Swiss-Prot record:
It comes from the Eukaryota. The active site is at 430 (nucleophile). Expressed in phloem-associated cells. This is Myrosinase 2. Belongs to the glycosyl hydrolase 1 family. Keywords: Abscisic acid signaling pathway, Disulfide bond, Glycoprotein, Glycosidase, Hydrolase, Plant defense, Signal. Glycans are attached at residues 340, 384, 504. The lineage of its organism: Eukaryota, Viridiplantae, Streptophyta, Embryophyta, Tracheophyta. One of its GO terms (molecular function) is thioglucosidase activity.
């Protein structure tokens, strides 16, 4: 396979070079290429003109993954995503996919390191599987030294390649034993169990890991796991989804979010008081979106503000002020838990950095209040989120079915966090684009030019946020290193810069066109016209220079 693959890549490079020459000769002068300030379209055909040198020398460019999505189930205890995808296989993806095997990175992690080295990245964000380290969830029930050794080898391999590890402690894969015992984050017992697990990780790995992430996307588990039932553990009100094994979509999301915040703050306090000597930093990851008014009415503008408060402020206000946003307290009422004075002090400032994941932008317009019997955390904001505005227009090019991306939203989100939340240190911990999945060959998966447009355009606006708005961003991680299991989508989509053959996961992971682009971007001045072309139409045939 490898011999044929190399021939194919060489052929694609030569073909790409011919296409690039034709584009230049037929439509424009080289200095007249689309600027990143345009919403659509974009072109990113020359990394000798836009590359990592446009960022500070200490800026970390990396890639990201998570344990359940790449490791496989070998050698660990069960987690809630095992339980969820086997209890509700149709919710694991249209292909009934799950993470039982996926990339089998537990055994093939050296191949992951090889791809990172080939790309030239300087950072790798990955997660520990809680149940691989503590198979029964609690430290008192036994430590899996094989799991410790696995992560230790991975960390050592990264450092040997001059790649900085960013470790996420919890990326949604709670040990099933804790969910069975007390419903996980619904119970405050989780705070002590999470602290014990984190304590072990700091103890065993803190000499080498200097960037710790407590919880990935604080918004996701409460909403998708406990309001909609679309994610593990699959709880919601019966009127939302009769398949949910229990739940209350009007109260449980707020309890889970509350306990997540307290668990996060408790672990940060542990690190600062007991492990400060290790010299590391710690913080949470937020899933972000940008929100635009559906139309020019006051109602839509107010709905947009409420959407930001419920989506971002739900977690950022406690982390900065020790309390929930006023509008949440007003609209949710006594369904929203309260922090006591000790908890508020624990929460305020409980981060050294923020990880921000950004993918898409949505429109918001006013939504009527729900009747008492149909209350849910998903509609309490009285804001309806859509992908098209009042004129039926999307905010940008297609992202996935029913959603669109808006690169300027990257700039908007970064500036929002700077001005509203005290100019924090930020790492963009996820940003990526999905293409069609399924059992397709490398020769088909290779042509992911839409991903190049996506990554380049977002990096353009990230650069603007740093240089023009002075946002304190120090790193950017592409999602993802390679194709993997995608939560709720199975293997029907591919996010990877590198190709994974799920019928032969031990095969080498070859770079797609986007991987070659990122590699070139990180090599500073390599002319890259041989592999790049814009997949988006030119606007009136006009091109401008990148600025």
């Amino acid at each position: 396979m490898q011999h044929n693959t190399y021939i194919y890549i060489l052929t694609m490079k030569l073909l790409g070079f011919a296409l690039a020459i034709l584009l230049v000769v037929a439509t424009c002068k080289p200095e007249e290429e689309i600027t990143c300030e345009e919403n659509v379209p974009f072109t990113c055909s020359q990394t000798d003109r836009f590359n990592k040198q446009d960022f500070e020398s200490d800026f970390i460019f990396g890639v990201a993954s998570s344990a359940y999505q790449i490791e496989g189930g070998r050698g660990r205890g069960l987690n809630v995503w095992d339980g969820f995808t086997h209890r509700y296989p149709e919710k694991g993806g249209a292909d009934l996919g799950n993470g039982d095997t996926t990339c089998d990175s537990y055994r093939t992690w050296q191949k992951d390191l090889d791809v990172m080295e080939e790309l030239g990245v300087k950072g790798y964000r990955f997660s520990f599987a809680w149940s691989r380290i503590l198979p029964k969830g609690k430290r008192s029930r036994g430590i899996n030294e094989d799991g410790i050794n696995y992560y230790s080898g991975l960390i050592d391999g990264l450092i040997a390649r001059n790649i900085t590890p960013f470790v996420t402690l919890f990326h949604w894969d709670l040990p099933q034993s804790l969910q069975d015992e007390y419903e996980g984050f619904l119970d405050r017992t989780i705070i002590d169990d999470f602290k014990d697990y984190a304590d072990l990780c700091f103890e065993r790995f803190g000499d080498r890991v200097k960037h710790w992430i407590t919880i990935n996307q604080l918004f996701t588990v409460p909403t998708r796991g406990y309001a909609l039932g679309t994610d593990a553990p699959g709880r919601c009100s019966q009127w939302v989804d009769k398949r949910c094994y229990g739940g209350d979509s009007s109260t449980e999301p707020y309890i889970v979010a509350h306990n997540q915040l307290l668990a996060h703050a408790t672990v940060v306090d542990l690190y600062r008081t007991r492990y400060k000597y290790q010299g590391g930093k710690i913080g949470p990851v937020m899933i972000t979106r940008w929100f635009l008014p559906y139309d020019d009415t006051l109602e839509s503008k107010q709905a947009t503000w409420r959407a930001k408060e419920f989506f971002l402020g739900w977690f950022m206000e406690p982390l900065t002020k020790g309390k929930y946003p006023y509008i949440m307290r007003k609209l949710v009422g006594n369904r929203l838990p309260k922090f006591n004075s000790t908890e508020a002090r624990l929460l305020k400032g409980s981060y050294d950095f923020l990880g921000l994941n950004y993918y898409v932008t949505q429109y918001a317009h006013a939504l009527d209040p729900s009747p008492p019997e149909k209350l849910t955390a998903m509609t309490d904001s009285l804001a309806n989120l859509t992908s098209l505005d009042a004129n039926g227009q999307p905010p940008g090019p297609p992202f996935s079915k029913g959603s669109y991306y808006h690169p300027r939203g990257m700039l908007n989100v970064m500036e929002h966090f700077k001005t509203k939340y005290g100019d924090p240190l930020i790492y963009v911990t996820e940003n990526g684009f999905s293409t069609s999945g399924g059992p397709i060959p490398f020769t088909e998966a290779f042509h992911d030019y839409n991903r190049i447009d996506y990554l380049c355009s977002h990096l353009c606006f990230l650069r603007k946020a740093i240089k023009e708005k002075r946002v304190n961003v120090k790193g950017y991680f592409v999602w993802s290193l390679g194709d993997n299991y995608e939560f709720c989508n199975g293997y029907t989509v591919r996010f990877g810069l590198s190709y994974v053959d799920f019928n032969n996961v031990t095969a080498d992971r070859d770079l797609k066109a986007s991987g070659l682009w990122y590699q070139s971007f990180l090599r500073d001045t390599t002319k890259n016209q041989d592999i790049l072309r814009s997949s988006l139409p030119f606007k009136n045939g006009d091109r401008k220079s990148l600025t």
